[in-house]
């Protein structure tokens, strides 16, 4: 099945502690149906010193959130929208904005 939200998309969080925040999708985890969004759902982890990180301490990193809790922000109209699929004349399958009808994939 084609993914409605992909890496590099700008999304808005619909519910939870970060409701209303927007950010770029850094990683998509299809098996768990989750996405990692830059600057959203930031958690603190206690890191022990190791070979890669000489100094330990508390680090902040983004944690995955469910894909159903985010909505794609349309590049043309700038609104959080649902995504649909359609075929172009040449037969390629593209995503489009359900609010304004513009094609998202160029």
UniProtKB/Swiss-Prot annotation:
PROSITE patterns, sorted:
RIBOSOMAL_L24
Q: What GO molecular functions are on record for this protein? A: rRNA binding; structural constituent of ribosome
Q: What are the record's GO terms for cellular component?
A: ribonucleoprotein complex; ribosome
Does rRNA-binding count among this protein's keywords? Answer: yes
CDD domains recorded for this chain? KOW_RPL26 (cd06089)
Which keywords annotate this record?
Ribonucleoprotein, Ribosomal protein, RNA-binding, rRNA-binding
Asked whether the keyword Ribosomal protein is assigned, the reply is: yes
A Gene Ontology biological process term: translation
Q: Which residues form the signal peptide?
A: none
Q: Which InterPro entries match?
A: KOW, Rib_uL2_dom2, Ribosomal_uL24, Ribosomal_uL24_CS, Ribosomal_uL24_KOW, Translation_prot_SH3-like_sf
**Which family does the entry's similarity section mention?**
Belongs to the universal ribosomal protein uL24 family.
Its biological purpose: One of two assembly initiator proteins, it binds directly to the 5'-end of the 23S rRNA, where it nucleates assembly of the 50S subunit. One of the proteins that surrounds the polypeptide exit tunnel on the outside of the subunit.
User: Partners and quaternary state?
Assistant: Part of the 50S ribosomal subunit.
Q: What is this protein called?
A: Large ribosomal subunit protein uL24
State the organism named in the record.
Thermosipho africanus (strain TCF52B)
Q: What is the lineage of its organism?
A: Bacteria, Thermotogati, Thermotogota, Thermotogae, Thermotogales
UniProt gene name = rplX
